[in-house]
Amino acid sequence: MVKCLLLSFLIIAIFIGVPTAKGDVNFDLSTATAKTYTKFIEDFRATLPFSHKVYDIPLLYSTISDSRRFILLNLTSYAYETISVAIDVTNVYVVAYRTRDVSYFFKESPPEAYNILFKGTRKITLPYTGNYENLQTAAHKIRENIDLGLPALSSAITTLFYYNAQSAPSALLVLIQTTAEAARFKYIERHVAKYVATNFKPNLAIISLENQWSALSKQIFLAQNQGGKFRNPVDLIKPTGERFQVTNVDSDVVKGNIKLLLNSRASTADENFITTMTLLGESVVN
């Protein structure tokens, strides 16, 4: 009996703290409301494993085992077409999507994605990467000129379901902003949730937040050793087009708005940042 108890405690000890993706997240636009969209984004965030919280914001893992690296968003359009979108939990990037027996991968998708995701499908590599510059070039449009909103998301799902090569880049821009970016920023989530029946063009505040997530994440982390002050200010733009700087964690841009922090340990050249991460015990997960 004692041996069994000890074994049980050992198993529990091994698994406590090991990050896991909690499963797929579903969203059906045919019955969507502002409330169900908000719940979808909240559920999406909740599936993402994190190291610890920094100023009450989850800090994503920089490295995680292949088996836990991706989660799926199952999205259904107004016309009941469903695609499964694969998200990398280390950075909330869209890496691939599946429609029926075919799957499509961004050009820079990690090798693990090809090995793990959508087995049994015919895998196609898209002729562009998933970054905004590449997608806007492929779409022949900038984000400011592409509609967002739940109707736009439904149309994007339909485009991707049937894979219209000409329209796919724009559809992917809609998909990324209404899912991944909304998970990162409460401001974007709330903006999309207002547009259940109509669409909108993203304002400059949305675009600048999307562009500066990495910079904001890094400065929020570094602020722990600087009394909440940023080492370097982060430039953003207001909806009116006015430019301003975020200089500390007490800013409204940070508090209640940023919901996930990118862990830049793997890519930053700042040795102090890397050292601090190590001292805090953020470890590589195998």
Curated annotation (Swiss-Prot):
Domain of life: Eukaryota
Gene Ontology annotations of biological process type: defense response; negative regulation of translation; regulation of defense response to virus
Signal sequence residues: 1-23
Active site: 93, 132, 181, 184
GO MF term (any one): rRNA N-glycosylase activity
Annotated coiled-coil segments of the chain: none
Glycosylation site list: 74
Reactions listed under catalytic activity: Endohydrolysis of the N-glycosidic bond at one specific adenosine on the 28S rRNA
Disulfide bonds, paired cysteine numbers: none
Record-linked PROSITE patterns: SHIGA_RICIN
Keywords for this protein: Antiviral protein, Glycoprotein, Hydrolase, Plant defense, Protein synthesis inhibitor, Signal, Toxin
Enzyme Commission number: 3.2.2.22
Miscellaneous comment text of the record: Possesses anti-HIV and antitumoral activities. Inhibits HIV-1 integrase. Manganese or zinc required for enhancing substrate binding rather than catalysis.
Family the UniProt entry places it in: Belongs to the ribosome-inactivating protein family. Type 1 RIP subfamily.
Biological role stated in the UniProt entry: Irreversibly relaxes supercoiled DNA and catalyzes double-stranded breakage. Also acts as a ribosome inactivating protein.
Protein name: Ribosome-inactivating protein beta-momorcharin
Provenance organism: Momordica charantia
